């Protein structure tokens, strides 16, 4: 059963993701912010992390950078409702920034449950392939 860490300050988002993933045979740990996510990461081996970009206190970008530094082999999915730069706007492309900081994939809120599951399965498959390649090299 894959272990997923969900880090988001919105309890409704966390609950929806948790319920959906548990119904699909994932073990889910929810953290309500970056600090709580780091504490969870220290005590548990996760197969994947899902992290919101915009959170109070420890910002999502800071969380993504630190999570990636501490656990570089764990796939990290960044999510945000304020994610894409509009061609007519000078706003930054936050999801691209998350990828540059170490996120494996990005999801723009709102996303469908199927989109979430697809991204998770792709990340887990890629991580398993990398692990298998490393083991075969030894």
Where in the sequence are the language-model features?
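A Lys-centered signature of the CheY-like receiver
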Residues: 109
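Helix N-cap/capping motif at the beta->alpha junctions
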Residues: 30-39, 60
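Receiver (REC) domain active-site loop signature in two-component systems and cognate sites
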Residues: 55
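Active-site beta3 strand of CheY-like receiver
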Residues: 44-50
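Short amphipathic alpha-helix used as the core "switch/output" element in two-component signaling
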Residues: 39, 61-74, 93
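Charged docking surfaces used in two-component/phosphorelay signaling
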Residues: 15-23
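Alpha4 helix (beta4-alpha4-beta5 surface) of REC/receiver domains from two-component response regulators
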Residues: 62, 83-105, 118
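Active-site residues of response regulator receiver
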Residues: 52, 80
């Amino acid at each position: 059963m894959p272990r997923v860490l969900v880090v988001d300050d919105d309890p409704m988002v966390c609950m929806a993701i948790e319920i959906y993933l548990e119904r699909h045979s994932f073990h889910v740990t929810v953290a309500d912010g970056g600090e709580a996510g780091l504490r969870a990461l220290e005590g548990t081996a996760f197969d994947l992390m899902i992290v919101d970009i915009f959170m109070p206190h420890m910002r999502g970008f800071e969380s993504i950078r630190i999570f990636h530094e501490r656990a570089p082999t764990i796939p990290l999915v960044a999510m945000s409702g304020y994610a894409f730069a509009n061609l007519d706007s000078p706003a930054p492309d936050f999801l691209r920034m998350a990828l540059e900081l170490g996120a494996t994939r990005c999801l723009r809120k709102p996303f469908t449950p199927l989109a979430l599951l697809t991204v998770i399965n792709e990340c887990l498959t890629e991580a398993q392939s990398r692990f298998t390649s490393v083991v075969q090299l030894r």
